[in-house]
Amino acid sequence: MPSLKDLKNRIGSVKNTRKITKAMQMVAAAKLRRAQEAAEAARPFAERMTAVMTGLAGSVGSSESAPRLLAGTGSDKVHLLVVMTAERGLCGGFNSSIVRLARAHAAKLLTQGKTVKILTVGKKGREQLRRDLGQHFIGHVDLSEVKRMGYPVAQGIARDLLDRFDKGEFDVATIFFARFQSVISQVPTAQQVIPAVFEGEGEVSSLYDYEPSEEGVLADLLPRGVATQIFTALLENGASEQGARMSAMDNATRNAGDMINRLTIEYNRSRQAAITKELIEIISGAEAL
């Protein structure tokens, strides 16, 4: 049975931990608001660009003049998986859920005889994936020095992907991230970015005149579209990370409070037992006299 001193030290230690988790929860809440605002501000542009490109892609179709980013290489042998996770932990199952989805996708491709290459964005994903898929790694993007996510970061990642695609290093690129829904709900998502995939009808291209041509405009927009998709994914990931961390720290704070209550009850019982024992000894001594 722990001594009163040990129990008192444990109570003090848990109280200090609760202060830390509460502070982290408040910081995550503030960062979450900023991340949500950034994600919401980027959506109209991304949706409009997607609508225009969808309409152009529908007009261009699978013609011989279709841009390579739309038509693809004609093969799907080599797949590049871009796995986006956080630089830090203490955010519940946020990182592991994205890694789990990427790992399952890689296993499926390998079973089909495909070649898999992995590019990680964020420290935590690299740490987890290197354990069993280290031989498939081709690069890593370090975001530890990025204080606030901006479009130039997405442009840099997109430029790297486009250069690798032009060099023939892969046929299909898919990004993995968590789509933000709420503080307690972040959905792991896989989204193909190269070659471009469009759903729906989008803007009707016949309503516009494109110069020099629809193919030329689409060829210019597609690289921007890749960067925009990556930027949107990074923003969604950022909001999801802060939401997950806020939820995890809230749970940790509550658990710390419950533990303090249990330890306090145990401390009081032990103290009461010690006092009772001393009283019994005093009374017994008095009776002996």
From Swiss-Prot:
Superkingdom in the source lineage: Bacteria
A GO-annotated cellular component: plasma membrane
GO BP, one annotated term: proton motive force-driven plasma membrane ATP synthesis
Stated name of the protein: ATP synthase gamma chain
Record Pfam families: ATP-synt
Coiled coil, from the record: none
Role of this protein: Produces ATP from ADP in the presence of a proton gradient across the membrane. The gamma chain is believed to be important in regulating ATPase activity and the flow of protons through the CF(0) complex.
Membrane topology: Peripheral membrane protein
Organism (species): Cereibacter sphaeroides (strain ATCC 17029 / ATH 2.4.9)
Binding partners and assembly: F-type ATPases have 2 components, CF(1) - the catalytic core - and CF(0) - the membrane proton channel. CF(1) has five subunits: alpha(3), beta(3), gamma(1), delta(1), epsilon(1). CF(0) has three main subunits: a, b and c.
Family from the record: Belongs to the ATPase gamma chain family.
InterPro entries to which the protein is assigned, alphabetical: ATP_synth_F1_ATPase_gsu, ATP_synth_F1_gsu, ATP_synth_F1_gsu_CS
PANTHER family hit by this protein: ATP SYNTHASE GAMMA CHAIN, ATP SYNTHASE SUBUNIT GAMMA, MITOCHONDRIAL
Keyword field: ATP synthesis, Cell inner membrane, Cell membrane, CF(1), Hydrogen ion transport, Ion transport, Membrane, Transport
GO molecular function, one term: proton-transporting ATP synthase activity, rotational mechanism
SUPFAM superfamilies assigned to the protein according to its UniProt record, in alphabetical order: ATP synthase (F1-ATPase), gamma subunit
Localization (cell): Cell inner membrane
